[in-house]
Swiss-Prot record:
Pfam family, one: CASP_dom
Keywords: Acetylation, Cell membrane, Cell wall biogenesis/degradation, Membrane, Transmembrane, Transmembrane helix
Organism: Raphanus raphanistrum
NCBIfam families hit by this protein: A_tha_TIGR01569 (TIGR01569)
Chief location bin: membrane
KW Manganese (keyword) present: no
GO cellular component, one term: plasma membrane
Name by which UniProt lists this protein: Casparian strip membrane protein 1
InterPro entries membership: CASP/CASPL, CASP_dom, CASPL
Subunit structure: Homodimer and heterodimers.
Domain of life (superkingdom): Eukaryota
Cytoplasmic side: 2-44, 117-128, 203-207
Modified residues (N-acetylalanine): A2
Function (record text): Regulates membrane-cell wall junctions and localized cell wall deposition. Required for establishment of the Casparian strip membrane domain (CSD) and the subsequent formation of Casparian strips, a cell wall modification of the root endodermis that determines an apoplastic barrier between the intraorganismal apoplasm and the extraorganismal apoplasm and prevents lateral diffusion.
């Protein structure tokens, strides 16, 4: 009586399984690479916008500080003992404004290299986090300077009847106009800093 023999070939299925697993891994790597490239391009666009905003903010803050620094007016009439003159250095708040906004402008210049790094390496977290924290601190300083100066400009235009403070802008019109321009410029820079912080927060968000 002849013996029956059974042959089981398991080599081919193993090969197919390995090939399938390699294909799955390659597909995952490909998808990850495409997602990273898309995220990097998106964040690079944000970084370029961030850099342009900083350049614009530098011009605005330098202009605001310079305009306030030149705020001065002397009335065409005077007495033997008194000359009617108004300048930014007559108000401690305006002096603080000039110094604070000058510091803000200097910070913006120093922040440009970090902004460039985020363009070159859009997925880098450290430079973006540094900018986010620093911008938040400087935003506080800018807001304080602009708000303090705005209160003095308001008093110069309207006075205060409760304390018998008379408005001076009817006499020192050019001085008040110059100071008001500086405050408006500083307020615009505050809005720019808010945008910069929002950009950094979006760039740090994980996809």
């Amino acid at each position: 009586m002849a013996k029956e023999s059974t042959t089981i070939d398991v080599g081919e299925p193993n090969t197919m399984t390995k090939s399938t697993s390699h294909v799955v891994v390659d597909e995952k790597k490909k998808k990850g690479f495409v997602a990273a490239a898309a995220g990097g391009g998106y964040k690079r666009g944000l970084a370029v916008f961030d850099f342009l905003l900083r350049l614009a903010a530098i011009g605005i803050t330098i202009g605001a500080s310079s305009v306030m620094f030149t705020a001065e007016e002397t009335l065409p009439f005077f007495t033997q003992f008194l000359q009617f003159q108004a300048g930014y250095d007559d108000f401690p708040t305006f002096q603080f404004f000039v110094i604070a906004i000058a510091i803000v402008a200097s910070y913006l210049v120093l922040s440009l290299p970090f902004s460039i790094v985020t363009i070159v390496r859009p997925l880098a977290v450290a430079p973006r986090l540094i900018l986010l924290i620093s911008d938040t601190v400087v935003l506080t300083l800018t807001t304080a300077a602009a708000a303090a100066a705005a209160s003095i400009v308001y008093l110069a235009h309207n006075g205060n009847t409760n304390t018998n403070w008379l408005p001076i802008c009817q006499q020192f019109g050019d001085f008040c106009q110059t100071a008001s321009t500086a405050v408006v410029a500083a307020s615009i820079s505050v809005a720019f800093f808010v945008l910069l912080i929002v950009i950094s927060a979006i760039a740090l968000k994980r996809h």
